[in-house]
């Protein structure tokens, strides 16, 4: 980094020329999955630390989604309460209020099931971690004539590989209206390089099952000014509801 005479610090990067992964191109998306699997395979490790007298042995812990989901559920309930008390509602608010109950029921059930699985999983017994990219999305996957490469590792951290896999897979499935054939092909591309173990498959299933897209829509609405609601919010909600049947179908296929 460099600092100018006013004390403002800048980070200088060497930037590579390339274009973003084309999310409409099936083969490019599958290659992005294989690239991710290769990254995880190369960066896998089992945490071991030498014992030192008087110094506690550090422990690397996996991110537990259920804790974040519990927080999201509280935020959804708060927004639902606000909507019920609001006397004059816009069309968006009427639509949102009508679907909150079933989505919240689903979110609560998923959270409880996932907590039981997390609690029964022995995370101390030589668990394998990897260094995750942390923001593995198509705009960080660039292509040159020589092939794909990754940029923006600022969020890189030690965690389970599903952190990256879930993010990219969910984005690609949303863009393809949760096409089951495409979803299975993308997952198969990843597993052709690095197969998932049973716990990782459960992890992926529950992350995809949680209605995170609805939470994002609700969270943006609740924390912004409600006098004027962008038309984009309505479009996102409509698209979410249109895709729900296809999403459920894919989850039935994925369920361990």
List the predicted regions and their residue ranges.
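ATP-binding pocket architecture of kinase catalytic cores
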Residues: 1-59
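Conserved NTP-binding catalytic cores of kinases and kinase-like/nucleotidyltransferase enzymes
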Residues: 1-8, 145-147, 255-256
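Active-site activation/catalytic loop segments of kinase-like enzymes and analogous catalytic loops
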Residues: 162-195, 208-228
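ATP/Mg2+ or Mg2+-diphosphate-binding catalytic cores
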Residues: 215-256
């Amino acid at each position: 980094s460099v600092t100018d005479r006013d004390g403002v610090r800048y980070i200088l990067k060497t930037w590579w020329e390339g274009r973003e992964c084309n999310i409409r191109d099936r083969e490019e998306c599958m290659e992005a999955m294989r690239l991710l699997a290769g990254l995880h395979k190369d960066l896998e490790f089992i945490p071991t630390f030498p014992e030192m007298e008087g110094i506690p042995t550090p422990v690397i812990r996996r991110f537990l989604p259920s804790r974040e989901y519990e927080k999201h559920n509280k935020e959804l309930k708060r927004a639902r309460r606000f909507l019920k008390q609001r006397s004059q509602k816009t069309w968006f608010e009427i639509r949102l209020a009508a679907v909150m109950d079933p989505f919240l029921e689903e979110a609560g059930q998923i959270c409880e099931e996932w907590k039981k699985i997390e609690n029964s999983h022995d995370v101390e017994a030589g668990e394998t971690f990897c260094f995750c990219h942390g923001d593995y999305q198509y705009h960080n996957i660039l292509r040159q004539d020589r092939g794909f490469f990754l940029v923006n590792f600022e969020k890189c951290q030690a965690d389970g590989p599903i952190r990256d896999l879930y993010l990219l897979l969910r984005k690609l499935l949303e863009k393809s209206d949760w096409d089951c054939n495409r979803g299975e092909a993308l997952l198969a591309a990843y597993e052709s390089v690095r197969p998932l173990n049973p716990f990782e498959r459960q992890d992926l299933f529950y992350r995809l099952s949680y209605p995170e897209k609805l939470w994002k829509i609700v969270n943006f609405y609740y924390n912004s000014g409600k006098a004027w609601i962008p038309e984009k919010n309505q479009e996102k909600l409509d698209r979410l509801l249109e895709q729900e049947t296809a999403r459920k179908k894919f989850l039935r296929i994925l369920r361990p």
